[in-house]
Amino acid sequence: MLDSSVPTFSVTTPLYYVNDVPHLGSAYTTVVADTLARFKRLQGYDVLMITGTDEHGQKIQRTAEAQELDPQTHCDRTVVKFKELWRSLNILYDRFSRTTDPRHLAIVKDFFQRVWDKGDIYLAQQQGWYCVACEEFKEKRDLLEDNHCPLHPNRKAEWRDEENYFFRLSRYQHPLEELYAQRPEFIQPSSRRNEVLNFVAQGLQDFSISRVNLDWGFPLPNDPNHTIYVWFDALLGYVTALLDEDEEPNLTNALVKWWPINLHLIGKDILRFHAVYWPAMLMSAELAIPAQVFGHGFLTKDGQKMGKSLGNTVDPLDLINRYGEDAFRYYFLKEIEFGKDGDFNEQRFVNVLNADLANDLGNLLNRTLGMVKKYCQGQGPQVMATDLAPDNPLKALGSHLGEEVSSAYERLSFTDACEAIFTLVRAGNKYIDDMAPWKLFKQGSQKEVEDVLYSVLESIRLSAYLLSPIVPRLSTKIYQQLGFTWDFDQWRSPLEQAEEFNRHQSWGQLGANQNLPPAQPIFTKLELPAEE
């Protein structure tokens, strides 16, 4: 059971579609979720991070058939690749939700019955253009020339004329508008909120929640000739994930501890499902609405949309194997303003990592530890933070940095968090150059030497701590080189974490005479692979 005295935080990635291996966008969203979960754990929250896979639907059935596999085997193999990528990225998720899990069927049935009993499901004829890749009917006005889908321009939408069960989305037009008005923070960023408001203002139409002639999916509880539509099934995967392993799978058990979710992180391509369909479904079942849906932008490569047909897709595992997981995590969170579209360029990737992590941070730590060994007999400076002059520039910058960076993490402004931290790192480099401790040492000014070196080491410590949600292994290396027995992948109780956070996000936690191990490089300079 959760301790009611401990604050809680729950965050989800999308349940990724397993028609193909995980791509760069999947890795991006998951790194963001993991970073935020790590930050909330640092603060002392009891955290639940949910990721997983959406495994039903026609697209998956056809993909499996093309490989001469049954759909379950295809799903099982693809799930292994997702989990392998999450391990490579050092993702510490709490639950991995699979929509083929038998327990998920129990949740879907339970939820369906509630909505059925409410009178919000009915049988009717559906005619229209259907995109298999989107698993969605499209309005004719939204299609490209020759009925191609705008999101999948290489694929034609298929004309369908079939009997389906529908959800009365139109009944929730006014309740949704009230939700958006009363809770403006529900959809973020504001550009996504405006997209949804414009869509809803055009008038909501009921949407089908079943398909005929589809074997791969859960049968409709009241009509086994129909298969439940993938989104009416997949969105409930967030609820199934809330069940403890030994709990009987029903809605009551699933919702008692962690519902409603604090934050759904998604790509903007599935915004409508999460910000319109999902809250309407929950209203119908008389369940609480999640606190926020945040739709981030798309990733491009060298300014171009990525696609197999263009031959410019980026395998995230290749990037990680070449440069390391912390390099991957840092680049995408620092360089791409979360919520907006962003670009990946490998030369810029290498340049940013070398400038920030190898040069500014890594070299600062190495040169400072080298001076400590030379000028302080290898022991940490015999200085406490309280011994420093009130006008010490690094102390002035560091004294409010924890609050500034915490605020940036709360706003999902990871770029701002990194910029604030590296303002202190760059100031540390400038301070050493300006104060020239090698000259002070020659002048016999030992106290001034130790003041300078302590100030810089404490700036590095504070920077590493505040960077740890983004680059946990790099931060662990730095903390250990500063004499702490610390691992940012290990967690204590929320109360202990809260106490540590209050101390370590503040300036002045490095002790006097800290026992410092020999300096070692923390981040090796990156190089582009040689052209073949």
UniProtKB/Swiss-Prot annotation:
Its main location: cytoplasm. Its cofactor is Zn(2+). A motif ('HIGH' region) lies at residues 16-26. Binds 1 zinc ion per subunit. It catalyses: tRNA(Met) + L-methionine + ATP = L-methionyl-tRNA(Met) + AMP + diphosphate. Zn(2+) binds at C131, C134, C149, H152. GO terms for biological process: methionyl-tRNA aminoacylation. ATP binds at K308. Keywords: Aminoacyl-tRNA synthetase, ATP-binding, Cytoplasm, Ligase, Metal-binding, Nucleotide-binding, Protein biosynthesis, Zinc. It comes from the Bacteria. GO terms for molecular function: ATP binding; metal ion binding; methionine-tRNA ligase activity. Disulfide bonds: none annotated. A motif ('KMSKS' region) lies at residues 305-309. It is found in: Cytoplasm. Its EC number is 6.1.1.10. Monomer. Is required not only for elongation of protein synthesis but also for the initiation of all mRNA translation through initiator tRNA(fMet) aminoacylation. HAMAP family: Met_tRNA_synth_type2. This is Methionine--tRNA ligase. It comes from Synechocystis sp. (strain ATCC 27184 / PCC 6803 / Kazusa).
